[in-house]
Structures are given as structure tokens and as C-alpha cells.
């Protein structure tokens, strides 16, 4: 009997041990399976991440290759050669060539201050199906607009686009194949400058070329500000450089201060002005720096190079990003500076305030 009981006890113990062994083996197998699954999941995630990174790198590489394959031809029509327009063209060319390198071809032409030549130049650009046209100065812009409604046109050194393009409802964009940058410095501040430096002024001569739309616009605005301040003024206009001397002589005979807006004809012939006004001690206020450096006293200046750079950035946006030129707002200079011609100021005995900066000449540079 004792032997049977002992046998049963031993059998029960062995069964219990077997059950424990089976349970341990099962747990171990489950842990191994879980570890395997986790390893497989981690491996799959890493593979997916690597694949995604490789795909992204490939896409970036393809984009860079596409960008490097871009090739464009840009036509530049500049109305006339003088320092302000030259600086705007230089800023534009520097910007697009830095971006595109050898993948941009620039056809730069100067119209020698002839509107008919502007038309001939831009017609050639259109016939050659250039990718973009830069029109430097208002007559160049008007000629380009007359020549094409398809090729993107950017203007620079254009004072007022609404006037230049005869736009009735101008909201900052032209709504046509045109955008660009303006060389307009605040006209109210220019009039303030006249009164600041010449508080006893009796009469201001407003002198400009009657065939330049932007000059007409600026003259009208300045005359309005002078009226508001009760300052007398008279208008003196010339058709071209041939009658500038007689017009300036008439102006100094009647007025004690001269104002000349940004005017391409005047800008190319400022020595005619200074040869008459400087010996008489008459202050001449100009619409921009380069005119002042040759034959004026003071100006509220912008950087023409900078507005050329801004136009270049617009060109890149149009050509490489496909931006619609008609939706790009006209750009304006972000900063203006009170500047003066130190030699002219000394010649007429004018002491300048401390917040006016002398214009650097080639000798000073």
C-alpha cells in the first residue's frame, strides 16, 4: 500500500514538473517571438525612413539638375546713358547673372534718348522671342508694352506706372504683362527740403522735359505741394536738350530756386544747368543723386542700383518660379537719403545741415 501511495506522489510531482517546464518553454517562445516581431518592425521602419530620405535626396537632386539646365535670354532696352539708369541696369544684370551664371544671355541695347529707337530695339526682342524684357526708363517701357502683350516686361527707373501706362485704376499691380521697380522718392519730402534749405524762397522754377510723362507727373505733384504751402512757382519746359540753355536762362531771370524732377533729358545735360545757375548762386534741387552730383545742390536720393537688383529678383521669380508678372506689385526704394553736392554748396555759399550726406565723387572714392 505504501509503495502505491509513494508511486502516486512521485507521479504527481513529475506531472507538476512537466507542466512547469512546458509553461517556461512556452513563455520563452512567446518572448522570442515578440523580440523577433519588434526587430522586424524596427528594421522595416528604418528601411522606410532610409527609402524616404533617399527619395527626397533624389528629388532635390533632380530639381537642382533642372535648375542648372534652365537657359534664358533677356533683352534690355535702356533709354539713354547716364549714371542713374546705368546703375539700375548694372544692379539687374548683377542679380540675374549671379543666379543663372552662363545659363542667361543678355542683349543690352541703348536707345540714345530716342523713342523711335526704343521701339526698334524692343521689336527686335519680340521677333527673337526673348524670355523677358527689361525696359529702363518710361519711354522704353511704353515701347515694350506697345510691342508685346505676351513676353513678361519689367520696368525700372520708371517713376509712376499709372501715368506711364495710362492706368485708371492702379492698385499696385498693372493687371497686364508688366511689373517692375519705381525710382520715385517721396515728393512731399522733396518739397520740404526746398523749404528747409531755402525758407525765404520767393519763387520756384519747376523745370522739366515736356515729352517725358513721368516728369510731367512729378511737376504736377510738386506744384500742388508748393500751392499748399503758399509758395509761388513757375513752369519752364523744354522739348529736348537743344533748348535747355534758353529755358534755364528764362528760369533764373524769374525765380530764385530751381527744382528739376527725375528727368532723363535733364540728367544727361546737367552741366548746362550748373554753368548758368552756379555763378548766380541759385540753389538747384534735383529728383535724384546723379543729377545733383553734376549740377545741383541737394536731393532726396534713392539707390538706382538697388531698384535694379529688385527688378532682377522679380525676373528670377518669373522665369524660374513661373510667377505671373501681372500679379507682382510694383517695387519702391526702401530707403531715401538727404544728400548734397559739397562743391556746389561751397560755390553758392550754402551751409548744409548735419543730417545731409555729401555725395561721393569719383575723386573721393
Feature map (PLM): residue ranges:
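An alpha-beta-alpha
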Residues: 74, 92, 179-226, 324, ...
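Extracytoplasmic "Venus flytrap"
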Residues: 67-94, 99-101, 107-117, 211, ...
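Sec-dependent N-terminal signal peptides of Gram-positive bacterial secreted proteins and lipoproteins
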Residues: 2-23
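Pocket-lining segment of extracytoplasmic ligand-binding domains
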Residues: 213-282, 288
